[in-house]
Amino acid sequence: MKPIPQTEAELLQRANQIAGCSFAELAEEANMDVPLDLKRDKGWVGQLLEWHLGAPAGSKPQQDFSELGIELKSIPVSYSGKPLETTFVCVAPLTGVHGLTWETSHVRNKLSRVLWIPVEGEREIPLAERHVGTPLLWSPNDEEEILLKNDWEELMEMIVFGQFDQISARHGVALHLRPKAANSKALTEAYNINGKPIKTLPRGFYLRTQFTAQILQNAFNSLLNEE
């Protein structure tokens, strides 16, 4: 792994250095094998980018670059630059949730400063031939923060009241909640609507593609304005 970057500028410089490179080129330098596809290696792209950017490995409550307060997120995009899938933020707490606030939440911590790295994601492009795009450092503006906060508070209220069967993909404008488990047997503890302990699937917070598409579009527009 490359050394941990000491400044935001150093991290961004590294991200710019790998922009335009193929996964094959990056994997060769990192001495990593390129899988045929991502069905069994969903975290492979993230691990490859972490190696090149110097992120300490592992999924943690704090940001990937905790010393810099920056979270790393790869984002698979289509030929037209639109996100192809929702973006995982963090696991949702299902117990001990009374008294939690947006200001101290893991979601807000993770999204306070994000290094977005678009990557080619069209399935017809062999994994080894996919390329890394231009990086983007982002923090939510006031409008985005309000959207995220409102969604988080609505979803957490449903968790507090044990309304798991009522939470659907329709809830949330920018952020939504959905099961996160490799299989349906991986159950975790929670409380139902009557306050009784139950077992349910772990849930994760995800950013909707419409929200991340707007982030990328805004960045692209600001680049055009600079030119």
Swiss-Prot record:
Location relative to the cell: Cytoplasm
Gene Ontology terms: cellular component: cytoplasm
Keyword annotations of the record: Cytoplasm, DNA damage, DNA repair, Endonuclease, Hydrolase, Nuclease
Highest rank taxon of the organism: Bacteria
GO biological process, one term: mismatch repair
Coiled-coil parts of chain: none
Keyword check for Cytoplasm: yes
Annotated SUPFAM superfamilies: Restriction endonuclease-like
A Pfam family that the UniProt record links to this protein: MutH
GO molecular function: DNA binding; endonuclease activity
HAMAP family: MutH
Function: Sequence-specific endonuclease that cleaves unmethylated GATC sequences. It is involved in DNA mismatch repair.
UniProt family annotation: Belongs to the MutH family.
Record's protein name: DNA mismatch repair protein MutH
Organism (species): Vibrio vulnificus (strain YJ016)
Taxonomy of the source species: Bacteria, Pseudomonadati, Pseudomonadota, Gammaproteobacteria, Vibrionales
GN (gene name): mutH
